[in-house]
Amino acid sequence: MAKPILLSIYLFLIVALFNGCLAQSGGRQQQQFGQCQLNRLDALEPTNRIEAEAGVIESWDPNNQQFQCAGVAVVRRTIEPNGLLLPQYSNAPQLVYIARGRGITGVLFPGCPETFEESQRQSQQGQSREFQQDRHQKIRHFREGDIIAFPAGVAHWSYNDGSNPVVAISLLDTNNNANQLDQNPRNFYLAGNPDDEFRPQGQQEYEQHRRQQQRQQRPGEHGQQQRGLGNNVFSGFDADFLADAFNVDTETARRLQSENDHRRSIVRVEGRQLQVIRPRWSREEQEREERKERERERESESERRQSRRGGRDDNGLEETICTLRLRENIGDPSRADIYTEEAGRISTVNSHTLPVLRWLQLSAERGALYSDALYVPHWNLNAHSVVYALRGRAEVQVVDNFGQTVFDDELREGQLLTIPQNFAVVKRARNEGFEWVSFKTNENAMVSPLAGRTSAIRALPEEVLATAFQIPREDARRLKFNRQESTLVRSRPSRSRSSRSERRAEV
């Protein structure tokens, strides 16, 4: 009788702790004065590259002033077929966009039940009866166009079960209140011997050499000879402690420390595909299940609102944490929120469409501009925007509060551009078109257009426009009503545009 009571108390404490952490993560820390005094923005390429056994990790320098202004860090991972990204957690919440490929991921919420389990007959095939049948927490499928949300401190892993590489762009919101360390992005690995993804390679080699020298200089320290030289969270513990904690022999405990593992953070699964317990779905079945998940989530959200109005608190662990939907596809053209037939489309994901983003305080936008189409001048009301170019090229201009052009250049595939909050921006696709994903530092990032049907100019009275710009009312009326589209428009050929491109090429 005592065990069920203790289990109930434990689950209640886990719920209270986790809900407190999630609630605390709502919001961002105050920026230091002057961090966003940017006179110039740049389209940035990755500055650090790590080649792992089954993939590549590329990161942008988090100390760059643009990332310091936005309070974020960005990493791009390429996972080869049959590649496994080892279990890890980070000090900041993160959004991941799947630019290419498909696979599976597991997210390890503390205290949640292991709802995926193999049958008893299957577990006994080829094994003695003393082994228990395997069970683990839920596994989620992902595909191209998905946004995946990972809360701070929650461990997760990913595996490429397809025939093409998976390319994933991850943004870590280091300025989020959930991060109580410092502004440096930190990944904590549960296995392997990974490199620090945000530290230059030469600096990492120096740090490893320095640690080895320190250990050699202190051979008499208690337990020092039993500690590994790996870089995962088990490496710094005494092997005896680990053996006691897991109730295994010391040799097995030492394997956890991955001292001589040189595969880094993306490893190859040898032989056949990774054997885990999961439903086998076709593409149609997966999309049908996604729709069901969204419907269940809307119903649960409605019930929670009714409960709060009725004065009842929802305290079920499985309802609040374990069944969180962490994924939303914004790459499918049929999912578009804004569509102009000759210009392009935009899809967004925010806390209304993916409620977990309410706690992460992040959202995203996926856009596609057709050849020579224009995303009208606009600004982000309440968020910084980190734009990653997925395909093609675009002319981009960004203007600050002094009316100065801080960026006037081309943004190409694989590059990043940070657009600070309230800075005005315009994008025009080149001949091959332009596709991008924008990570935004607010759960419900809002955009205000400067031209078009829903613009600030359209909302002003004609007389105000005429007086402000010193133009006749007829011209003010044309400013307001000549453009009927809302956001994306088909642009006309411009002689000044071609001459500007020629001047840029000469420079």
Curated annotation (Swiss-Prot):
Q: Where is the composition biased (Basic and acidic residues)?
A: 281-315
The record ties this protein, via Pfam families, to: Cupin_1 (PF00190)
Q: Where is this motif: NGXEET?
A: 315-320
Q: What intrachain disulfides are recorded?
A: 36-69, 112-322
Q: Which CDD domains match?
A: cupin_11S_legumin_C, cupin_11S_legumin_N
Q: How is it modified after translation?
A: Proteolytically processed from a single precursor to produce an acidic and a basic chain that are linked by a disulfide bond.
Leader peptide range in chain numbering: 1-23
Q: Which GO terms describe its molecular function?
A: IgE binding; nutrient reservoir activity
InterPro entries listed in its UniProt record: 11S_seedstore_CS, 11S_seedstore_pln, Cupin_1, RmlC-like_jellyroll, RmlC_Cupin_sf, Seed_Storage-Functional
**Keyword Nuclease found:** no
What is the annotated tissue distribution of the protein whose record heads this document? Expressed in seeds.
| Positions of region (IgE-binding) | 1-15, 57-71, 89-103, 105-119, 121-143, 145-159, 201-223, 233-247, 257-295, 313-327, 377-399, 417-439, 465-479, 481-503
- Bias type Low complexity, positions: 214-228
UniProt keyword list: Allergen, Disulfide bond, IgE-binding protein, Seed storage protein, Signal, Storage protein
For the region Disordered, give the residue spans.
191-233, 281-316, 484-507
Keyword match Disulfide bond: yes
Looking at the record, the residues that make up the Cupin type-1 domain are 41-254, 328-477
**Gene Ontology annotations of biological process type:** seed development
Q: Which family does it belong to?
A: Belongs to the 11S seed storage protein (globulins) family.
- Entry function: Seed storage protein.
Name under which the protein is recorded: 11S globulin seed storage protein Jug r 4
Species name: Juglans regia
